[in-house]
């Protein structure tokens, strides 16, 4: 895996086009990304930053920081794990939908369940998912320790 902790001033980071940088890193790690997926990720970053002005979803405040420190980190699991086709994934403590939404965008075959205990974050993520027209993804407002009690969720996730 060739993911590094770059800053805007370091060589190789394209501050003008972080989506291009992300695509390059993905290709270097054997993951092809379509223009549609890049556009979806770009819209996700916009929506995340819009919602972040209302409620605290992520610590990073600039688009470049979100691309580098949230999007790239979220999808880096795809560089090291071969998630089986159609796998079910649970994102515990999703906050602003990270890493679940970027994973779903790049791997639409996955079934993704996002979980957060804070209702206002869940509402923000629901809005973002609806805006992106994502299917095969849901968000639940719950505490992780209560998840085994929920009908149909006990031991039903691959990752």
What are these regions (language model features)?
Residues 75-159:
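Conserved SAM/SAH cofactor-binding pocket of Class I
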């Amino acid at each position: 895996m060739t993911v590094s902790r770059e800053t805007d001033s370091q060589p190789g980071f394209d501050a003008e086009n972080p989506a291009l940088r992300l695509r390059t890193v993905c290709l270097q790690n054997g993951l092809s990304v379509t223009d549609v997926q890049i556009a979806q990720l770009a819209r996700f970053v916009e929506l995340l930053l819009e919602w972040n002005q209302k409620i605290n979803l992520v610590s990073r405040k600039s688009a470049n920081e979100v691309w580098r420190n949230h999007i790239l980190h979220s999808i880096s699991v795809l560089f090291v794990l071969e998630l089986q086709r159609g796998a079910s994934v649970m994102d515990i403590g999703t906050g602003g939908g990270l890493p679940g939404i970027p994973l779903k965008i790049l791997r639409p075959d996955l079934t993704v369940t996002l979980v957060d205990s804070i209702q206002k974050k869940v509402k923000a993520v629901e809005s973002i998912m609806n805006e992106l027209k994502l299917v095969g993804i849901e968000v639940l407002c719950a505490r992780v320790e209560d998840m085994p009690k929920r009908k149909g969720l006990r031991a039903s996730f691959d990752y």
